[in-house]
């Protein structure tokens, strides 16, 4: 049986993640407050950020940027798309 959470992004009860996505306090918060659907939305947004900003995830600075954007995406004012970004349909 899947667990449900009140998703902070979708503002509704939804299926929760099966496990904590990464270690630490932020990982616990995501596990407890973010739904599987919202997490998948974030993964798509994160991929777009990595590609558009040409982030190298070996660099600590790039990983910290993504962590900050994730906090904004779920718990803050939201993570914006890069200026000039055009979505391919």
From Swiss-Prot:
Q: Which InterPro entries match?
A: Fe_traffick_prot_YggX (IPR007457), Fe_traffick_prot_YggX_sf (IPR036766)
Q: Which GO terms describe its biological process?
A: cellular response to oxidative stress
Q: Which GO terms describe its molecular function?
A: iron ion binding
> Pfam families attached here?
Iron_traffic
List the keywords (alphabetical): Iron
Under Gene3D superfamilies, the record lists: Fe(II) trafficking protein YggX
* UniProt cross-references to SUPFAM superfamilies, sorted A to Z: YggX-like
Lineage, top-rank taxon, reads: Bacteria
Q: Does the keyword Acyltransferase apply?
A: no
User: Can you list the GO cellular component terms from the UniProt entry?
Assistant: cytosol
Q: Which family does it belong to?
A: Belongs to the Fe(2+)-trafficking protein family.
Functionally, this protein is described as follows: Could be a mediator in iron transactions between iron acquisition and iron-requiring processes, such as synthesis and/or repair of Fe-S clusters in biosynthetic enzymes.
The name of this protein is Probable Fe(2+)-trafficking protein
Q: Which organism is it from?
A: Legionella pneumophila (strain Lens)
